[in-house]
Amino acid sequence: MPPGRPEVYQERFDIVQPHCSSEHTISLNTDFSKAAFGSATGLVAKAASQTTTAIWNLHADAHDFSNSSYLSKQVFAANLAHIGVAFIWLSGMHFHGAYFSNYLDWLQDPSIAPTAQQVSNIANQSVLNPIRVTSGFFNLWLAEGITSTYQLKVIAAFGLIASALCFLGSYFHMHSSTSFTRVLNTKLTSLSTHHLVGLLGLGSLAWAGHLIHISLPVNILMNAGVAVPSPHSLLSSKAVATIVEQLSFSALTSSDGYVWQPLVYSAMHHFALALVLIVGSVLGPLSTASNPLMSFTVGSSWHLVLGVQLFVTGTASVLYAQMSNAYPVYPYLLTDHPTVVSLFVHHMWIGGFFLVGAFAHLSIGLVRDTLPQSFSVVLTQRDIILGHLTWVVAFLGVHSFGLYVHNDTMQALGRPDDMFSDNAISLLPVFARWSTLTLNSTGSAVSVLGVELSTADFMVTHIHAFTIHTTVLILVKGFLYARSSRLVNDKYKLDFRYPCDGPGRGGTCQISPWDHVFLGLFWMYNSISVVIFHFFWEYQSNLASIKASAGGSIRALASDFELNSINTNGWLRNFLWSGAAQVIQSYGSPLAAYGLTFPASHFVWALSLMFLFSGRGYWQELIESVLWAHHKLYVVPHIQPRALSITSGRAVGFTHYLLGGIGSTWSFFLARIVATAG
C-alpha cells in the first residue's frame, strides 16, 4: 500500500467465478506501493510537466490527499480560503447595493421592481436599464433591519476585512511549521464539534438576537410608518419593549402578503436551534462520544464526514427551496415573483449538486479509508438492496409514463372523457383537500401562497418519484460497489477512478465509482429539471389565471398547467414552445440580456455533445493531426498537447452540459416571469 495509507482489510465480498481456473485467470498488477497518490513521480512527472497532462492532473488529483499530519492543514487552509472568497462576494453585493441600486426607493415603495447596475449608453446598452435584481438581497436586507446605504457600506467594508483575515489564516495554517496548527487541527472530531458549536450554534444564537433586538423592531416601525431610529438605540431591552407594547406584532401579520409573521418564527427557530446545537454537541447525541458518525472509522475519514455533511446541506437546500414559496420568511417576497422563482430554482440546483457530491465523497472514503467490520453487513446485502431499488424504479417508470401515454392516446383518438384529468377521470392526490391556494391583492400586486393540487400534479409527481429513484439507484450502486464487484473484485486497489481498459480485461468501462458519479450527474439534471419545470409552469400559470371579481376579491380559474400538462404535447407546446416566446422575442427590450444568454447557453450545451459522443481515438487523431501541422510549419508549442482521456472527455462534456442547460433554463424562466408577472 502507499506510504502513510492505512492497510485495507481483506475484502470478504469477492465473488469467484466457478468456471475460471487459476491458469486462465489474468493477473492484474495493482501494486501502487511505488507511486505517490496525488502527484506524478519520476519520468511521469517530468513528462507531464511539459504536456497538457499536467493541467488534467490538477483537476483529477484535487481530492488525492495523503494521510499525513499535513492533511488537516490543507483542508483547514482550503476551508478558510473558500470562506474568504465568500466574504469578498458578499462585500461586493453590499457595495453595489449601496452605490448602484434602488434599494432606498424600494424601501419606500416595495411594489416597484428591485434594480441595480445602471448601464452606460455607449452603443445602445441603455436598453438593458434597469437590470432586474432577482437574488432576494433586498428582501434579506430588510429582514436584517438595514435601512440606509451607510449600513450597506459598513457591511461591505467589514466583508473585505473578514476576507483578508480568512486569507491570512489560510496562509498561516498552510505554511506554518509550528506544532500549534498541527495539534489544533489534527483531530477531525474536534473540528466537527467546532463547526457545530462555534459556527452553527453561536451563529444561530447571534442571528436570533439580531432578529429580536434589531430586525423585528425596525420592521414594525417601518410597517407602521414611524421613523426608524439608529439601530444602536434599539439594543436596550427597554426600547424593544416600548416598541412592542405600543405597536404590537400585529403590524407584521398584515394580510397583503408583504410582511409575514414567519420573521418572528425565524427568531424562535434560530434560538431553539442554537440551544440544541450548543448543548447537544457537548452533552447530547451530537457529541463526539455518542455520535453514531464518530463511533467507528467514519470519524477518521475526511471524505466520509464530508459526504455526510454534503448530504445534510443538500437536503436543507432542497427544503428551503420548497419553503421559499410555501412559507416565505423575508418581507415583501410574496409579491416579487421573479425572486421567488429564482430562489426556488437556485436552491434546487445547489441541493442536487451537493447530494451527488455526497455520494462521490462517500465512495472515495470507502475506497481509500479503512472500513469497519460492522459496515460489512450493509455491503453483503447490497445485491438485495439494489434489486429492490431496481424494481421500484422499473415500476415507477412504467406506470408514471404510462399515465401520459394513456392521455396522449385518448387525445389522439378524440376521447377526452377517457383521459386522466380533473374534468374526466380524476386522480387527485390524497392530501389535495388540505392543500389550498391563498391569493391576496393590494393595488396591482398579487401574492400567491401555496398551491392547489390537481390531477396534473398527481401525474408529474410520479415522474419526480421515478427520476429521483433512478438517480438514487445509480449513486447508491456506485457507492456500494466502490470497493469490489463481480467483475473487478479489487477495485479498492485501483482507487476512486481508473481508466476504461476496453474488453481486454473483461471490460472495465463505466464501472468505477467516478463513472457512477458521472452518470448520476445527468440523472440529477433530469430530476431537478422536471421539478423546476413543474414549479415554474404551475406558479406562473396560477398568476396568469387570477381574475378580479366585481367585489374586489380575486379568484383563480383553471390554469394552463392544470389543463395542458396532463399529456406530452402540452409540455412541448404550451410550456416549452409558447413559454419561450418572451426570451426569443426579447431583442431590443430590457429582456435582451436573457435573449442573448439563451442561445449562448444552448451553444455551450451543444458543445458538450462533441465530448460526450466521442471516444479517445477521435481526440488522439485530432491531436496527432494538429501536432503534425505544427511540426510542418516549424511552430512547435512548448507545452505539448495530449489527447483527452475518456475520463477527461467526460468531465469536459458533463461540465458544459450542465452549465449550458442551467443557463438556458435560467434565461428562459426569468424572461418569462419578468415579462408576465414582474
UniProtKB/Swiss-Prot annotation:
Residues reported to bind chlorophyll a: 610, 618
Give the enzyme's main class according to its UniProt record, as a single word: oxidoreductase
The residues that the entry says bind chlorophyll a' are 602
Q: Which Gene Ontology cellular-component terms appear in the entry? A: chloroplast thylakoid membrane; photosystem I
Annotated [4Fe-4S] cluster binding sites: 500, 509
Give the domain of life.
Eukaryota
Q: Which reaction does it catalyse?
A: reduced [plastocyanin] + hnu + oxidized [2Fe-2S]-[ferredoxin] = oxidized [plastocyanin] + reduced [2Fe-2S]-[ferredoxin]
Functional description taken from the UniProt entry: PsaA and PsaB bind P700, the primary electron donor of photosystem I (PSI), as well as the electron acceptors A0, A1 and FX. PSI is a plastocyanin/cytochrome c6-ferredoxin oxidoreductase, converting photonic excitation into a charge separation, which transfers an electron from the donor P700 chlorophyll pair to the spectroscopically characterized acceptors A0, A1, FX, FA and FB in turn. Oxidized P700 is reduced on the lumenal side of the thylakoid membrane by plastocyanin or cytochrome c6.
Return the protein name.
Photosystem I P700 chlorophyll a apoprotein A1
Query: Source gene?
Result: psaA
